[in-house]
Amino acid sequence: LGSAYVRYYSRLRAAGDREGCAKLNGMFLITYLILGAAVLAIGFGLSYCDVVFGKKLTAEEISLAQRLLRILTVNAALTFPISVFESHVTINERYLFQKIVAMGKQVLNPLIMIPLLLMGYRSVTLTIVSLIFTVLSGVINIFYCLTRLKMPFAFHRYDFALLREMFGFTVYVFIGIVVDNVNWSIDRTLLTWFH
């Protein structure tokens, strides 16, 4: 989805259309908020369906799986609107900032997770820490985009024609990602089928 934002934003920026850039930012943010809300609704809905977890789990394991699914759903839902700001950092070529945020997450993650594991905390705590990292990196990106990059937003006149065009572009990108993932994981899939 980030590649669609980069493509259309760079096209508008090259044309010098600042108002178009602001409308595009608003449109992407609204679209990604809607997608995030859909992920939230689907994830929470699935967390209440015992069929999803199968029949081999105990009641305690199902309860744990439900909590984990809810936390991971919130994490996934937040990544959609946050990706608008991360893509804006990319389009403005602030790679050093991106690398510092990514390295901060990579360094802090084991520094926090390993002591928590050694203290006896389990998967729910680790998943919550992962959610906290997502929120913190998102807040940092949002703050950077709004203060340093002066990211403009306009939320009037939603451009449905552009949304259709963008959807067509995104479908091809999505198919490419799925094919790439299938190619990279076919060996594991075959092993699980035949094992």
Residue ranges and their predicted role:
Residues 45-46, 57-82, 99, 103, ...:
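Alpha-helical transmembrane segments of multi-pass membrane proteins
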Residues 77-104, 121-124:
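Membrane-interface junctions at transmembrane-helix termini in multi-pass inner-membrane proteins
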Residues 1-15, 90-91, 149-150:
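Helix-loop junctions and terminal segments of transmembrane helices
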Residues 40-48, 71, 110-118, 138-146, ...:
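Membrane-embedded alpha-helical segments of multi-pass transporters/permeases
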Residues 32, 68-72, 76, 98, ...:
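Residue-level signature of transmembrane alpha-helical cores of multipass secondary-active transporters
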Residues 16-26, 37-73, 119-128, 153-155:
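Membrane-interface helix-capping segments at transmembrane helix termini in multi-pass transporters
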Residues 124, 141-189, 193:
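Interhelical loop/hinge segments that connect adjacent transmembrane helices in multipass membrane
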Residues 96, 107-139, 147:
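Membrane-interface helix-loop junctions in multi-pass transport and translocation proteins
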